[in-house]
Amino acid sequence: MRRTLVYGLGESGEAATRALLQRGERPLAADAASGEGPRRVLEELGVEGVLGAGPEVLDGVDRVVVSPGVRPRDAVLREARRRGIPVISEVGLGLELLGPGVRVAAVTGTNGKTTVVDMARHILRVAGVAHAVAGNSWRALTGCLEEVRRAGVLVLEVSSFQLHHLPPPGFEVAALLNVRPDHLNWHSSFEEYARDKLRVFGGQGPGDLALLSADDPICRRAAGGLRAEVVLVGEGETGVRDGRLLLRGEFLAGERELGFAGGHNLKNALFAAAAAARLGAGLEAIREALRGYRLKPHRMQVVAEEGGVTYIDDSKATNPAAVAAALLSLGGRPAVLILGGSEKETDFEEVLPHLGGCRAVVCQGEAGPRLRDFLSERWGGEVVLAGDLASAVEAARRLARPGDAVLLSPGCASFDQFSGYEERGEAFARLAGGRRAVRG
């Protein structure tokens, strides 16, 4: 019997190990760490395991299923490549175990993929189309295989980490929303990152659908070489014209009818509508769903209003492109911007043209000093350095004036102070002194 190593025992690694056990296989489970988390997984599963694993764990192994948190430069993965041992992602294993018969719409992109998946599932729910959702920000695919088989339709969010080790998947629908510099501490270069994003179109044929952003240069260059039917979202018959959202020339909704704002979110809605339509949602259901949709938390969400100042949680903005989109969506409203978090060494050059409406920028967290130095040199406005989010909110409160927004759009991950962007957003809401608002 083939011997599979599951390497990395986070949520996806645990789910992959369970799925293999349910198939009657006896995988080897391993993690480079040796802490309580991986140890608990091994005890619960009762599977052979190795903690503090090094390259020797590959002895007798025929393939490796790798968790997305493991970087390609990891010693075990380097040795696997040297030995010619196949390496696949947990998503790749999930697709293999699913087998044929499930229609899959896969969504990737630097920004917006979780929102597009959430919009698509909302549309499918309103349309009465049975479906399941998995991947990246959702459940591990290998942890919900039976549900996916029963539904027959899967909306799958895939990250560059998951695509890096994914064989050509042949998705019926593949969507690439945008490609901006991000995760360069994981990928060896931006070029590798972009190549991994484009792997979402691997294995597609003329009967499949490829959705790409019309205004993203990498998407436009890639579109001409794809075998699937290509729709460039944001121009022509699938775009926004005179404040009207159109899908293949059919009217969906006016901007003012929607419960969310921002050009990036309108485009997200078009991606979701195009994918859902291919999976069986009718036009009337799409129209109804979009008019009733509200964004998930931590995406340009108003969390407090105090003294004429509005506090906006955009904690999900973990790269510079997302910060630029957030500032653009303010429409020139004066703002105090809170930037910073854990360091990813990303270039904030593309944020500079959008700082015109900012009264000040507060830089905080691990990346704070670098961002302070960058902005002090390249931008003429007021720049303040704060040690952490709490002191950043206090500084922003002092700087803001009635009518301003205090915008948490960090452009960085959160792991210097928090377990994730959700915890960071909740902390911001508490520090701002308000409850979460219901609007957009």
From Swiss-Prot:
Residues annotated as transmembrane: none
Cited Pfam families: Mur_ligase_C (PF02875), Mur_ligase_M (PF08245), MurD-like_N (PF21799)
Catalytically driven reaction(s): UDP-N-acetyl-alpha-D-muramoyl-L-alanine + D-glutamate + ATP = UDP-N-acetyl-alpha-D-muramoyl-L-alanyl-D-glutamate + ADP + phosphate + H(+)
Pathway info: Cell wall biogenesis; peptidoglycan biosynthesis
Keyword Cell division part of the UniProt annotation: yes
Residue pairs linked by disulfide bridges in the UniProt entry: none
GO terms under cellular component: cytoplasm
Keyword Methyltransferase: no
Annotated SUPFAM superfamilies: MurCD N-terminal domain, MurD-like peptide ligases, catalytic domain, MurD-like peptide ligases, peptide-binding domain
Main subcellular localisation: cytoplasm
Subcellular location: Cytoplasm
Binding site for ATP: G109, T110, N111, G112, K113, T114, T115
Keywords of the record: ATP-binding, Cell cycle, Cell division, Cell shape, Cell wall biogenesis/degradation, Cytoplasm, Ligase, Nucleotide-binding, Peptidoglycan synthesis
GO molecular function, one term: UDP-N-acetylmuramoylalanine-D-glutamate ligase activity
EC number of the protein: 6.3.2.9
Function field: Cell wall formation. Catalyzes the addition of glutamate to the nucleotide precursor UDP-N-acetylmuramoyl-L-alanine (UMA).
Family assignment from sequence similarity: Belongs to the MurCDEF family.
Protein name from the UniProt record: UDP-N-acetylmuramoylalanine--D-glutamate ligase
